Amino acid sequence: MKGKFIVIEGIDGCGKTTQINELSKWLPKSGLIKKGSKLITTREPGGSLLGKKLRGLILDNNKTNKPSSLAELLLYSADRAEHISKIISPALNNNDWVISDRFSDSTLAYQGYGRKINLEIIKKVESIVCQGEYPDLTFFLEISPEESIMRRKNEIPDRIESEGIRFLEKVNEGFKLIAREKKWKVISASQNIKTISNQIKETLLNNFSNDK
């Protein structure tokens, strides 16, 4: 039996990293992970060694290095292919749990709804890249674009974060559509950290307690 693959999605500033850190402390003691298995936390882009190099290319804020929308899509896809091959699939086949900060639906939201690349093209690329490796459960931490920008006002933005509120609005609407279509667990990220964390934990217990 394979391990579990959990993904946390949302626009920048929604608290994905914070919640993954909370889960990394709770899950090993929760009783959900089988004895002998472990928890692996990862992210996209940059979850593998090659991915870290690709992340630098993708998020470089130097305007002279800005890739075309199609090149950007393929860079993310290359990162994901390596991520699945080197990190995600080996862990799941070892009965480990994997929690990822973003996965393939971020590409649909950002490159599809944000960049307006044809969604069917993205889905075809992703079907080749993912090779049937999809999350068992996805959480969508939902905040408004305005709150996202406010939370990040003291940070140095990367290239994607520098796109502005109109781009972020399109991405956020994309996430909402995907969340409804795929029946994600949607959680308001405007709540305090503990409340969000408790809702995530409760959902995991409800979904996977019988798999222990």
Curated annotation (Swiss-Prot):
It is an enzyme of class 2 (transferase). Keywords: ATP-binding, Kinase, Nucleotide biosynthesis, Nucleotide-binding, Transferase. GO terms for biological process: dTDP biosynthetic process; dTTP biosynthetic process; dUDP biosynthetic process. SUPFAM superfamilies: P-loop containing nucleoside triphosphate hydrolases (SSF52540). ATP binds at G10, I11, D12, G13, C14, G15, K16, T17. GO terms for molecular function: ATP binding; dTMP kinase activity. Belongs to the thymidylate kinase family. This is Thymidylate kinase. PANTHER family: THYMIDYLATE KINASE, UMP-CMP KINASE 2, MITOCHONDRIAL. Phosphorylation of dTMP to form dTDP in both de novo and salvage pathways of dTTP synthesis. NCBIfam families: DTMP_kinase. GO terms for cellular component: cytosol.
